[in-house]
């Protein structure tokens, strides 16, 4: 007696038999991908929060250090100015330090009529004028100087600070990310200190357009950042700009953590800048 043969599966049954486990596999993989994606997004968010917090702490510490130094210089300048005001013929002296380089006297025309150590430098730009003290940027060769001035009778006492050394000691050795840096601007977006010496004393937007006039620069995002930094005392913002320390001038997504540094009745802006993507790798 012949055995009955099993009925052959139709192509639809075969397709269904293949697609059911395949569909289950696809759903499983998709679910895993969603879970992994959610976990990665949570990790990325947590990492970014941690990194920006570190940047904020770096900016706070830097601003505090600069404030202490400026107060020390202001006290030194006040002391010298009081002596000059009391004795019109006084030829003031100052003890040199790592950053204090000289003391000058200027006449009513702004001409240096006395220099304790005979240091000469060229005046570049007024950085900040407060009620009692004005802050100026000078240079001599590759050296930049912060010159703090105060009226004393018919003369102006000038304390000459080596801003290049000040930047090197307080700021340039601080590592922010793999290629980040710290810069300082005044309340009118004039660069006070920057890792690129050519940018000292220039306006952040207009000066860079002049320096890189052979390049077509999109500084719209940077301009928005500057407006926000003027209005807010501290914060962390992302924007698009260029790596000014890279000769190829690549346009990148950046993060800036910033804080106002009070200077008399004005302020400077201390800003830490890193590459947005690289900041997720290392700070």
Predicted regions and their residues:
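Conserved beta-strands of PAS-like sensory domains
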Residues: 141-175, 186, 192-196, 253-259, ...
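Conserved beta-strand cores of small sensory beta-sandwich domains that regulate signal transduction
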Residues: 78, 102-104, 181-183
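Extracytoplasmic/periplasmic ligand-binding sensor regions of membrane-associated signaling proteins
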Residues: 106-173, 178-181
């Amino acid at each position: 007696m012949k055995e009955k043969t099993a009925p052959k599966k139709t192509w639809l049954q075969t397709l269904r038999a293949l697609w059911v486990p395949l569909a289950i596999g696809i759903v499983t993989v998709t679910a895993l991908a969603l879970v992994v994606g959610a976990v990665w997004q949570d990790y990325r968010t947590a990492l970014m929060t941690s990194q920006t917090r570190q940047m904020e702490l770096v900016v706070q510490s830097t601003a505090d250090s600069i404030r202490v130094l400026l107060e020390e210089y202001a006290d030194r300048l006040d002391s010298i100015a009081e002596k000059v005001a009391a004795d019109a013929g006084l030829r003031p002296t100052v003890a040199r330090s790592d950053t204090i380089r000289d003391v000058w006297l200027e006449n009513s025309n702004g001409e240096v009529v006395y220099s304790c150590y005979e240091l000469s430098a060229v005046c570049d730009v007024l950085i900040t004028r407060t009620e009692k003290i004005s802050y100026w940027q000078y240079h001599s060769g590759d050296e930049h100087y912060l010159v703090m001035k105060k009226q004393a009778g018919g003369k102006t006492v000038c304390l000459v600070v080596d801003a290049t050394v000040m930047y090197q000691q307080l700021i340039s050795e601080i590592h922010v990310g793999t290629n980040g840096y710290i810069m300082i601007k005044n309340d009118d977006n004039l660069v006070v200190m920057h890792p690129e010496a050519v940018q000292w004393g220039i306006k952040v937007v207009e000066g860079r357009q002049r320096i890189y006039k052979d390049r077509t620069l999109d500084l719209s995002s940077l301009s928005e950042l500057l407006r926000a930094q003027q209005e807010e005392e501290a914060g962390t913002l992302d924007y698009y700009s260029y790596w000014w320390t890279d000769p190829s001038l690549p346009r990148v997504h950046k993060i800036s953590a910033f804080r106002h540094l009070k200077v008399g009745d004005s302020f400077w802006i201390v800003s830490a800048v890193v590459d947005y993507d690289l900041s997720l790798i290392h700070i």
